[in-house]
Swiss-Prot record:
GO terms for cellular component: photosystem II reaction center; plasma membrane-derived thylakoid membrane. One of the components of the core complex of photosystem II (PSII). PSII is a light-driven water:plastoquinone oxidoreductase that uses light energy to abstract electrons from H(2)O, generating O(2) and a proton gradient subsequently used for ATP formation. It consists of a core antenna complex that captures photons, and an electron transfer chain that converts photonic excitation into a charge separation. The gene is psbJ. It is found in: Cellular thylakoid membrane. This is Photosystem II reaction center protein J. It comes from Prochlorococcus marinus (strain MIT 9215).
Length: 66
C-alpha cells in the first residue's frame, strides 16, 4: 500500500475495506498534531507566568508609603 487512503475531506478513514484499522494505534492520535504533553507543558508555563505577573503586581508599591 504505497499511497494513503483519504476521504473527500482529506481525512484518513477509520477502517480499510477489509475491516482492519487504517492507522496503527500507536499513531492514531498523534499524526499531524502536536503531542498532548507539549501542549500541556506550554499551557502550564503560561499559567505560572500569568500568576507571577499578578503576584508581582499585587506587591508593587507595598511598603513604599506615601
Amino acid at each position: 500500500m504505497s499511497k494513503k487512503l483519504k476521504g473527500p475531506d482529506g481525512r484518513i478513514p477509520d477502517r480499510l475495506p477489509d475491516g482492519r484499522p487504517a492507522v496503527a494505534w500507536e499513531r492514531r492520535w498523534t499524526e499531524g498534531t502536536l503531542p498532548l504533553w507539549l501542549v500541556a507543558t506550554a499551557g502550564g508555563i503560561a499559567v505560572i507566568f500569568v500568576l507571577g505577573i499578578f503576584f508581582y503586581g499585587s506587591y508593587q508599591g507595598v511598603g513604599a508609603g506615601g
